[in-house]
């Protein structure tokens, strides 16, 4: 049943830059992605992505309104 799930509201985006890693163990990547469809076509967003990701990957976004906060500098 889970295989039949289709996100009709999802929009494709292409990863154009990887800004860094975040999360307690570094499992979240912060990426800049270019929206490829919908009303925000061509817009570039900063998003947090869980899991392995590389330049040129396509990700599906359920919404394109929110943008991730920029990563802060690491404290020593």
UniProtKB/Swiss-Prot annotation:
Record keywords, A-Z: Ribonucleoprotein, Ribosomal protein
GO molecular function, one term: structural constituent of ribosome
SUPFAM superfamilies per the UniProt record, alphabetical: Nucleic acid-binding proteins
InterPro entries linked: NA-bd_OB-fold, Ribosomal_eS28, Ribosomal_eS28_CS
Gene3D superfamilies: Nucleic acid-binding proteins
Pfam families noted in UniProt: Ribosomal_S28e
GO cellular-component term (any): cytosolic small ribosomal subunit
Designated name of the protein: Small ribosomal subunit protein eS28
Gene that this sequence comes from: rps28e
Family statement: Belongs to the eukaryotic ribosomal protein eS28 family.
NCBIfam families: PRK04007.1 (NF003080)
Residue ranges that the Swiss-Prot or TrEMBL entry lists as coiled coil: none
Swiss-Prot/TrEMBL GO biological process terms: maturation of SSU-rRNA; ribosomal small subunit assembly; translation
Native species: Methanococcus maripaludis (strain C7 / ATCC BAA-1331)
């Amino acid at each position: 049943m889970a295989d039949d799930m289709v996100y009709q509201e999802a929009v494709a985006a292409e990863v154009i830059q990887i800004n860094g890693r975040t999360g307690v163990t570094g499992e979240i990547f912060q990426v800049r992605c270019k929206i490829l469809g919908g009303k925000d076509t061509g817009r570039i967003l900063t998003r947090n992505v869980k899991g392995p990701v590389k330049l040129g990957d396509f990700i599906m976004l359920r919404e394109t309104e929110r943008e991730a906060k920029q990563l802060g500098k690491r404290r020593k």
